[in-house]
Amino acid sequence: MVKVVKRDGKEEEFIPEKIVVSILKAGAPVDVARRIAKKVECMVMERENVTAKELTRYILAELKKVNEEWYRNWIVFDQAVKRRRTEEELK
């Protein structure tokens, strides 16, 4: 089972449904959210662990390919709610 290494160093089980929920919050429909979550899951399934930043990078890359507005919504949400500067952190 893949573990996610959170920004604070804690580890938790990789749960694809969390990706789906986050993408839904960005405005994408369920089918798109599930498709992106499945792609990301396939990217990491052979690994022992993955960092939260890596996951975010993968998710945003896929989201941007599909819809620039949903990508922007994710960034705005991270800035407003989570107080993160996601685009800068991922450079």
Feature locations, PLM:
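Long, C-terminal-biased catalytic regions of enzyme "large/alpha" subunits
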Residues: 1-91
